[in-house]
């Protein structure tokens, strides 16, 4: 290890952890596929043993997921959450664990193929937006990525059984498709006689029993019933084929998608160089390729399902790229061209990443709308109903204030009941026209269907607008039309209206709701709220507080 290579390695790692932290800071909100883990982390930190208040009991999702990764993150991020935003604390904790796993791979590459190869592995990864962007996100695939990275690190150290054991744990607890990656690794190791079948069975069975036992005990406690979540998810998505309900893609989808995920046009070139000139690196190429090939037979495809393969390819590319810094391996002219191509590819990747980060900030209108509502309304006790789409695009329990009441009712019949919906002070919805009778639009997020590419100071000097389509729907903040008093009210202030139609009330208390015989009430108790009970003719019968 030369001093220059060592400095390069340290700087590359600092750059990677900085990118992960900055990306999560610029886009702190999460989407629906991340909601289970995010809500679980919040509930474990907030409610601890009081499972009755956990979000998954009301919104369990299509399939069960393991609580083990969320429990781990909740414990690690608990103390940091005292000093920074709890949402960011959780995101940064996941990001740190992801970086540490990448650093582990880099160290193993450095010991086997040279420090420069380890540094180039990190550089390749830094310039790949999708990999870095998702490394701090509470996705089960990212928890799986952390595990598969550590497995890859042990593989590079020739610790084959340790590598296999980690993959078994990850497949049993986090993501079942990792079992396919495990099979794709075991086959060449057996054929090359790097492992024996007897010891493989011993390690595999013991690891499986430990992993399944841990998941069965811990997850059964949180779910309130005996279960092995990842087995249920596998049966639901693969055996029953229910994953296709979320859409299907052609067989070649992943292979077309890979160059876009690399974001660096030279990655494939250095993969080829590595395959041709460095025999030990070939395992890093055909194992993930075979994994992607077999996985492509499943109709429902999302790029995050194959994210585990990206570090394998990056490792092989980095080993191949390190040859371009070795003048004795190639002619001088070829050496200069390859080195120029390497740096050009890295620069291109960073430019593309900067652009994509800017665009992705528009992908969370729900979270942005709730943040904007906090800027508009500073009353300590407010009730908000949030429709499905805003909750899918950034709203989590981490975003909620303890003194506010939040409702996520999805039943169309209840939402169409004017008395039910009128009990809320504000609505956050993508469909404001459904509530025109009782609410006014006061703010919108993502109302512009286009995302401007150029900054304002530059676009003012260009006659033609340069923009791209905004894929996210607009979200609106609606305020209740009824006028309200600014000070808390008591029952006696409105007792004179008893026996009269409730519509005669012109100035309503700050916190209230109207209750008809068929009204389904929210279950919260609020000390300052007045409840106006009416009969079928809208005559006020009595008033209560709370």
Curated annotation (Swiss-Prot):
GO terms for biological process: dolichol-linked oligosaccharide biosynthetic process; protein glycosylation; protein N-linked glycosylation. The lineage of its organism: Eukaryota, Fungi, Dikarya, Ascomycota, Taphrinomycotina. This is Probable Dol-P-Man:Man(7)GlcNAc(2)-PP-Dol alpha-1,6-mannosyltransferase. It is found in: Endoplasmic reticulum membrane. The keyword Cell division does not apply. The chain crosses the membrane at residues 5-25, 67-87, 113-133, 166-186, 200-220, 258-278, 283-303, 305-325, 340-360. It is a multi-pass membrane protein. PANTHER family: DOL-P-MAN:MAN(7)GLCNAC(2)-PP-DOL ALPHA-1,6-MANNOSYLTRANSFERASE, GLYCOSYLTRANSFERASE.
